[in-house]
């Protein structure tokens, strides 16, 4: 966070990216030398106290080819389940971001009660990441759009770098997501 009164914790093993983030944000890095495990996070939460934990970790659909199936399931499914479990034990509120990609899009006009019918690995991993006890958890199923810090694979990046005068798209679609500036 750029706001000094907010504590922001993160994990990033890339030293160059860490330095850039530390320079621009009030961030403290969690030393995560081992794999993501319930034991590692239980130890971390035993040493620290939080009112809220917001899960901003996820492997996005545009990058799922860079990661193994095991890594995608660990980050998008298992990690939120671990934090959800810890929220009950450590009495913090947990905010978890999910995606409309838990649906195939075939039906349209989905509601919260609709069957999550994802068929691809990304959608299924995010769907499983929503299977939480929800005692202290709020799941926000939304999309983000904005400039990326390090890659240019997002919709906005594609749109801004296209040389075409006209692009194909939808005329009656509604975007209900958030920008990464919010």
Predicted regions and their residues:
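N-terminal Rossmann-fold cofactor-binding loop
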Residues: 9-18, 33-35
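NAD(P)H-binding glycine-rich loop region in Rossmannoid oxidoreductase-like domains
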Residues: 32-75
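N-terminal Rossmann NAD(P)H-binding glycine-rich loop of SDR-like oxidoreductase domains
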Residues: 1-6
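SDR active-site strand-loop-helix element
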Residues: 11, 53-57, 94-100, 104, ...
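Conserved Rossmann-fold NAD(P)-dependent oxidoreductase catalytic core, especially the SDR/UDP-sugar
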Residues: 81-117
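NAD(P)-dependent short-chain dehydrogenase/reductase
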Residues: 131-181
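Conserved catalytic-core motifs of eukaryotic protein kinase domains, centered on the activation segment
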Residues: 21, 63-70, 105-109, 151
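Glycine-rich NAD(P)-binding loop of the Rossmann-fold in SDR/ketoreductase-type enzymes
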Residues: 67, 71-82, 116, 120, ...
